[in-house]
Amino acid sequence: MPHQQILMLFGLLPVATNISTWWNFGSMLLACLTLQLLTGFFLAVHYTANINLAFSSIIHITRDVPYGWMMQNLHAIGASMFFICIYIHIARGLYYGSYLNKETWFSGTTLLIMLMATAFFGYVLPWGQMSFWAATVITNLLTAIPYLGSTMTTWLWGGFAINDPTLTRFFALHFILPFGIISLSSLHILLLHEEGSSNPLGTNSDIDKIPFHPYQTYKDMLMLTIMTIMLLTIVSFFPDIFNDPDSFSKANPLVTPQHIKPEWYFLFXYGILRSIPNKLGGALALTMSIMMLLTLPFTHTSKLRSMMFRPFMQLTFWTFTATFLVISWTATKPVEPPFTTISQVAALMYFLFFISNPIMGWLENKIMKL
């Protein structure tokens, strides 16, 4: 067994002294995953994957099953917590140049895609009005694929429309994907500890390290406590804060909701999809909104790893963050002026971040004579 693994077993994993709170979100994601697995199992025990019974089974869980309401709310709001943590975790990776650790970054991006797929399948399961129409809109994007599109859509649906087979396979996928997430998370952590964590300065940490326990373990526990308090506060006092009113009506294929929109954590991607008035173009932009993350290790031209000493890149990063929020906001609005224009400009700026990344690096190298 390699030397580092032995150290890890004893909690003596060496960690940079100067890593900030932004490095705590990895352990928080692990806690979220554990919570989702436990609550998900107890919900699956009582859930019925049938289009006539799914909606009623959710009502049965919340009303009749002991602490079922708590399991259901913890699972739904836990998913939101999961995405809050993963978006902060990715933003930290972007800001501090963690993407230069290629294997870890690629496994992390794959984890994000798997998480998004799992969340989408889970959103369909209650078979509410918004679940049904969100599934219809998103799965319909497959038809935009030339030649294979229609065949793939029919294969995914299990028929010529979204029906009982669709719900059954979505439940099966929602159940099995988290096991893939667990496996890939283990690989992600293993690959990270091959090289070790970065630090805010983006320098080599070898000269100044401390043991993981007790320093980082207590820091992790503090952040986990804060997250638990937030989660339980929302579950207890504002359980429907992330819900859509249409989710409380049973799916009706004959009535289209006024405004179809996904959960808040998919709004940025949905906004990018909607900003392009072409089905295939929108589907490609949607895919690229995530896939662009994979280009970052190859487009990093700066001699400095972290953005801590790169003012131009900091401005670009915070513009990107604001753009992300603006796209999410416009995606909640109807498709009419001025929202269409705002969303198109924001989508363009979103992709410009990835294009400007190498240019900014080169420019900063010139200015600082590196």
UniProtKB/Swiss-Prot annotation:
Give the stretches traversing the membrane. Answer: 25-45, 69-90, 105-125, 170-190, 218-238, 280-300, 312-332, 339-358
Alphabetized InterPro entries for the sequence: Cyt_b/b6_C (IPR005798), Cyt_b/b6_C_sf (IPR036150), Cyt_b/b6_N (IPR005797), Cytb/b6-like_sf (IPR027387), Cytochrome_b (IPR030689), Cytochrome_b_C_euk/bac (IPR048260), Cytochrome_b_N_euk/bac (IPR048259), Di-haem_cyt_TM (IPR016174)
Membrane topology of this protein? Multi-pass membrane protein
**Where is heme b b566 bound in this sequence?**
H89, H188
Question: What subcellular locations does the record give?
Answer: Mitochondrion inner membrane
Q: Which residues bind a ubiquinone?
A: H193
The residues that hold heme b b562 are: H75, H174
A GO biological-process term = mitochondrial electron transport, ubiquinol to cytochrome c
* Cellular component GO terms held in the UniProt record: mitochondrial inner membrane; respiratory chain complex III
- What is the required cofactor set for this protein? heme b
Q: Does the keyword Transmembrane apply?
A: yes
Q: Which Gene3D superfamilies match?
A: Cytochrome Bc1 Complex, Chain C (1.20.810.10)
Q: Which PROSITE patterns match?
A: CYTB_CTER (PS51003), CYTB_NTER (PS51002)
**Keyword line:** Electron transport, Heme, Iron, Membrane, Metal-binding, Mitochondrion, Mitochondrion inner membrane, Respiratory chain, Transmembrane, Transmembrane helix, Transport, Ubiquinone
Cofactor annotation remark: Binds 2 heme b groups non-covalently.
Other remarks in the entry: Heme 1 (or BL or b562) is low-potential and absorbs at about 562 nm, and heme 2 (or BH or b566) is high-potential and absorbs at about 566 nm.
Q: Report the family membership.
A: Belongs to the cytochrome b family.
Q: What does this protein do?
A: Component of the ubiquinol-cytochrome c reductase complex (complex III or cytochrome b-c1 complex) that is part of the mitochondrial respiratory chain. The b-c1 complex mediates electron transfer from ubiquinol to cytochrome c. Contributes to the generation of a proton gradient across the mitochondrial membrane that is then used for ATP synthesis.
Record text on subunit structure and interactions: The cytochrome bc1 complex contains 3 respiratory subunits (MT-CYB, CYC1 and UQCRFS1), 2 core proteins (UQCRC1 and UQCRC2) and probably 6 low-molecular weight proteins.
The protein here is known as Cytochrome b
Species, as recorded: Chilabothrus strigilatus mccraniei (Ragged Island boa constrictor)
Gene name? MT-CYB
